[in-house]
């Protein structure tokens, strides 16, 4: 049976939708809508379902595209060409979404599918996907784009790294604990169908050789490790960009107001959280040139990704949004020849191994494996450079790279795990003169730094050419480094050559999702009409589960429309 195309009911807002898992779990009754007065930016008069006005209005410093015709009966545009320090008029919509990563995107997709007349504004700090290109490919080094074009912009950071969709609820964070395993797995199927309808490859990695998988698992068990074999749909970096480009076009054509190069500075909260009377009324935003205005909305969704995790943590503290510090992952990205990982790559594509090595028994795991891939650099606010990896469908290297992450849980009185991880990252950057550090594993065991001339003689040639040879152990804490070393030695028992002397370790690899927003199964926070999704919420880790959280949120909001 041929795969349905872009004209499928899922994409075009048919009422014939897949079942809404959350709605079957006993949702709260929808609160009555309050009518918002028209304003001098957008003026509404009625809500026809089928009239669609497609327009792009651009004012200095903010691109607003996809003005809803079915939500805007009469469109009045009075956008002033104001100076950068003046305030512009407010905007009123039904739903405002902060962050155009997978969680924010799928909130909009699912909401439009079941409630196509909903007026939605999607606020994104970065650029449209067609303008998201890293200059490093041309100039050979990071030029410090602000904000980083790899971590910000439409589709977020995950889709721009390797584009892997994990098709099991066992991978991707703790969301199943919140909503239930069955609900999570059913939502994965709906999200996967959506990606397929936008052009994802139908081939699934890791399901063709169960006998080989069983043997790899046996070897892992003998080494004291757990293998999580998860089916993977690999988009590839270049294919992910094509798919998300189609999704961006679809949202624009459906009338979503896409506000790029626009930063959310605050949420608008009325009432008192201490007396359970607090409610979110929208957000305040600032454009690239400094213009500020408010977006008033009945529902506010914050999905700022790992890059926005510390910002959301500050927001939670300022507005008494209930949250708690969670674990933080600190580690390295390792790189080795494809020959070492050939069997695992061919059978599983991505091996997810978990261990609790002596002496500290911290959880250590592999993450984001890229056969034939490339190590990359990402920049966060403040110029923090962190390492990542990605892979292409067509372009291949001679190496495989993957992350090894050590999970740190902190006890009272310490409650700043994100700041802790950033300090470690800053120390790595200082030792590398602003660049990513790289060191050979054999040199670590020998207690010496790595020199550039030694890398040039190695069988493993770095795919991040501007990484600086040095001493990773001088930057990572003893507990972290010891756990990583012992984990690598254990993996070497299951995959001979994994811990060879020439295996490269790049640092720092940091995952900023340690702030966990307290929510219920309906994805409600303690602030009415405010929802926090994706990796910044602390509940998901990765592309698929962030998409799932957005899918469920969109279905929930549509049921109340």
Outline where the language-model segments fall.
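Alpha-helical transmembrane segments and their juxtamembrane interfaces
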Residues: 38-43, 49-53, 64, 134, ...
């Amino acid at each position: 049976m041929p795969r349905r195309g872009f004209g499928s009911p899922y994409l075009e807002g048919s009422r014939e939708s897949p079942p809404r898992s959350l709605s079957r779990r006993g949702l709260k009754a929808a609160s009555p809508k309050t009518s918002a007065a028209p304003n001098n930016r957008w003026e509404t008069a009625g809500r026809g379902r089928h009239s669609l006005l497609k327009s792009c209005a651009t004012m200095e410093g903010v691109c607003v595209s996809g003005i809803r015709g079915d939500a805007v009966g009469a469109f009045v545009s009075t956008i002033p060409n104001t100076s950068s320090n003046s305030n512009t008029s407010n905007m009123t919509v039904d739903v405002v979404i902060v962050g155009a990563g997978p969680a924010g995107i799928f909130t909009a997709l699912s909401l439009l599918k079941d409630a196509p007349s909903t007026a939605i504004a999607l606020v994104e700090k970065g650029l449209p996907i067609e303008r998201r290109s890293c200059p490093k490919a041309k100039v050979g080094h990071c030029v410090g784009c602000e904000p980083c074009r790899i971590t910000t912009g439409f589709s977020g950071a995950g889709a721009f790294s390797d584009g892997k969709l994990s098709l099991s609820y066992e991978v991707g964070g703790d969301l199943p604990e919140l909503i239930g395993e069955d609900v999570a797995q059913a939502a994965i199927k709906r999200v996967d169908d959506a990606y397929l309808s936008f052009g994802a490859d139908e081939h699934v990695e890791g399901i063709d050789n169960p006998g080989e998988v069983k043997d790899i698992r046996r070897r892992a068990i003998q080494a004291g490790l757990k293998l999580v074999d998860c089916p993977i749909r690999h988009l590839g970096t270049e294919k992910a960009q094509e798919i998300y480009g189609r999704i961006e076009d679809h949202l624009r054509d459906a009338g979503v107001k896409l506000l790029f190069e626009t930063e959310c500075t605050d949420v608008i909260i009325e009432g008192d959280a201490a007396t359970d009377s607090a409610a979110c009324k929208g957000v305040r935003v600032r454009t690239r040139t400094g213009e500020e205005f408010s977006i008033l909305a009945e529902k506010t969704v914050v999905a700022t990704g790992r890059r926005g995790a510390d910002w959301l943590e500050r927001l939670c503290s300022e507005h008494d949004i209930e949250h708690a510090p969670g674990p933080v992952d600190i580690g390295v990205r390792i790189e080795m020849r494809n020959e070492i990982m050939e069997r695992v790559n061919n059978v599983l594509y991505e091996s997810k191994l978990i261990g609790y090595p002596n002496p500290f028994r911290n959880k250590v795991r592999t993450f984001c494996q890229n056969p034939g891939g490339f190590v990359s650099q990402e920049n966060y606010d403040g110029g923090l450079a962190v390492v990542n990896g990605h892979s292409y469908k067509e372009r291949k290297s001679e190496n495989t790279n993957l992350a090894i992450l050590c999970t740190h849980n902190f006890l009272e009185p310490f409650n700043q795990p994100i700041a802790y991880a950033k300090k470690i990252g800053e120390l790595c950057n200082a030792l590398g003169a602003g660049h990513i550090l790289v060191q050979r594993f054999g040199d670590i065991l020998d207690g010496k730094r790595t020199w550039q001339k030694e890398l040039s003689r190695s069988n493993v040639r770095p795919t991040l050419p501007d990484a600086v040879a040095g001493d990773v152990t001088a930057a990572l804490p003893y507990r972290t480094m010891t756990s990583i070393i012992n984990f690598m030695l254990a993996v070497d028992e299951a995959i001979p050559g994994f811990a060879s002397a020439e295996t490269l370790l790049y640092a720092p690899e940091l995952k900023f999702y340690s702030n966990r927003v307290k929510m219920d199964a309906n994805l409600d926070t303690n602030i009415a009409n405010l929802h926090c999704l994706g990796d910044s919420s602390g509940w998901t880790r990765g592309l698929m589960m962030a998409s799932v959280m957005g899918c469920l949120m969109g279905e929930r909001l549509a049921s109340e429309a």
